[in-house]
Swiss-Prot record:
Residues that, per the record, bind ATP: 14-15, 22, 93-95, 103, 128-134
Protein residues bound to substrate: 14, 46, 78, 92
Catalytic activity: (R)-4'-phosphopantetheine + ATP + H(+) = 3'-dephospho-CoA + diphosphate
Cellular component terms per the entry's GO annotation: cytoplasm
Name listed for the protein in its UniProt record: Phosphopantetheine adenylyltransferase
Location in or out of the cell: Cytoplasm
Cofactor: Mg(2+)
GO BP term, example: coenzyme A biosynthetic process
Species this protein is from: Xanthomonas euvesicatoria pv. vesicatoria (strain 85-10) (Xanthomonas campestris pv. vesicatoria)
Amino acid sequence: MSVANSRTAVYPGTFDPITNGHIDLVNRAAPLFERVVVGVAYSPSKGPALSLERRVALAQEALAAHTNVEVRGFDTLLAHFVREMGAGVLLRGLRAVSDFEYEFQMASMNRHLIPEVETLFLTPAEQYSFISSSLVREIARLGGDVSGFVPASVVEALRQVRQSRAQA
């Protein structure tokens, strides 16, 4: 088990898919920390559209410009992953007031599980505050244009998912 380092932050999520809002949060966090670990959760119960490997690869591509950001998949309890990474900070994004209740509950639970780790909430730029992965997936599933919400590589990955489902 690693010792918590306040200069290392973990930003967890399913990132199914990674959006411009997620990228904006990492862009804001990267200058604040020596190391930011984007933890891509396996989360089979959420029925992800993209495999864990594909989500990790898309996030790595989207965040490649940051030398202090690494992307890792995980399939353990978040508290265990945070400890494994030696992080002292857990980053969470708040898009709107509606996110707060859930995030507050999660932060409280994490405080009990990993009391040595602080949760830090960041808000995305206003132009990204309405973007969610679930909305992007639904728009893409129905053939809509998601290019304003995600990187081009994600647009292509979602197009491939839609195409493979149409052929099934």
